[in-house]
């Protein structure tokens, strides 16, 4: 698969404070990549580096094969970006907004505007003033604006902010359609983890400036679903026994409970081992966690943002 975005050992320090610390990840052609992290984790700083607003202190960023530090203009041409709510002129029509932006890009052919309008399904309302649009329609117009330059990578920062459930679903379906029909890669920064779970193919989790995980959403959800909670006595003896099984991972104690990751199919086998070793089993249950639960665990339960 072709790499549309590649970060390698990227760091950013301002006035001696490290905001982003040696992060590396890739985004491939035709995929939706979610970027998650709590407040102050380094998400905004990373996005500012991706779109060329600030330069990395260390490391390299490549966009569609163009190194940002040596081929800045070529790299930036490959990106379309919306940071939260798109910047639009409410007193102009949707068409006039797109036409103004097209002029800035040197686009003189109305066919390109018509193409993106049809793509975001705004043809019936494109000649109405933007101030009459719903927030969801404004998001779609903003995406149309970002697509005018035919980018290979679309960066959306908190795209669902302010949208009602219907608007969120509409945006999610549109992103999937966009990727399928145009083979565009989409990079989404968001704090709505349930949405990331439904929209994205892969996810990168950043905390305190460091990447703590890059994985497929499918694998993360599977991992979360394999958590098992044990209530046993004596606790330490049970922990020692669990540690002898290499297939049982991430063994932790919380409020006299033992939490671990293991196949639910092994529960009966472990119960038999506990009984044989005179360990009293008071309770056991599988944890049907969500991606959000796993995220909170990875980031120390910090507030999302």
What residues fall within each predicted segment?
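ABC transporter nucleotide-binding domains
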Residues: 2-5, 12-188, 193-207, 211-213
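Short, Lys/Arg-enriched, disordered terminal segments
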Residues: 1-4, 302-305
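ABC transporter nucleotide-binding domain
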Residues: 173-261
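Short, charged/small-residue-rich alpha-helical element at the C-terminal edge
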Residues: 226-298, 305
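Short coil/loop linkers at secondary-structure junctions
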Residues: 67, 108, 123, 248-249, ...
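Non-catalytic alpha-helical coupling and interface elements of nucleotide-dependent molecular machines
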Residues: 103-106, 300-304
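Hydrophobic alpha-helical segments typical of transmembrane helices
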Residues: 78, 97, 112, 174, ...
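Solvent-exposed alpha-helical segments within well-ordered globular domains of core cellular machineries
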Residues: 77, 169, 173, 194, ...
């Amino acid at each position: 698969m072709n790499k549309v975005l590649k970060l390698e050992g990227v760091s950013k320090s301002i006035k001696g404070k490290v905001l982003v610390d040696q992060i590396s990840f890739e985004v491939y052609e035709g995929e939706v990549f979610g970027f998650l992290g709590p407040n102050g984790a380094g998400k905004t700083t990373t996005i500012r580096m991706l779109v060329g607003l600030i330069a990395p202190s260390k490391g390299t960023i490549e966009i569609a094969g163009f190194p940002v530090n040596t081929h800045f203009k070529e790299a930036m041409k490959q990106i379309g970006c919306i940071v939260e709510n798109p910047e639009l002129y409410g007193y102009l029509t949707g068409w006039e907004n797109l036409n103004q932006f097209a002029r800035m890009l040197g686009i003189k052919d109305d066919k390109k505007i018509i193409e993106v309008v049809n793509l975001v399904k705004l043809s019936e309302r494109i000649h109405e003033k933007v101030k009459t649009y719903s927030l969801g329609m404004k998001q779609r117009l903003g995406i149309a604006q970002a697509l005018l330059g035919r980018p290979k990578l679309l960066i959306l920062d908190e795209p669902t902010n302010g949208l009602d459930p219907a608007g969120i679903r509409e945006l999610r379906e549109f992103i999937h359609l966009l990727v399928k029909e145009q083979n565009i890669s989409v990079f989404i920064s968001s704090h709505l983890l349930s949405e990331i779970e439904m929209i994205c193919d892969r996810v990168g989790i950043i905390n305190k400036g460091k990447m703590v995980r890059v994985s497929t959403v499918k694998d993360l959800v599977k991992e979360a679903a394999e958590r098992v909670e044990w209530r046993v006595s004596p606790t330490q003896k049970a922990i020692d026994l669990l540690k002898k099984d290499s297939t049982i991972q991430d063994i932790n104690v919380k409020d006299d409970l033992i939490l671990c990751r293991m196949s639910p199919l092994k529960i009966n086998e472990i119960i038999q081992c506990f009984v044989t070793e005179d360990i009293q089993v008071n309770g056991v249950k599988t944890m049907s966690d969500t991606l959000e639960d796993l995220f909170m665990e990875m980031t120390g339960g910090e507030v999302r943002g």
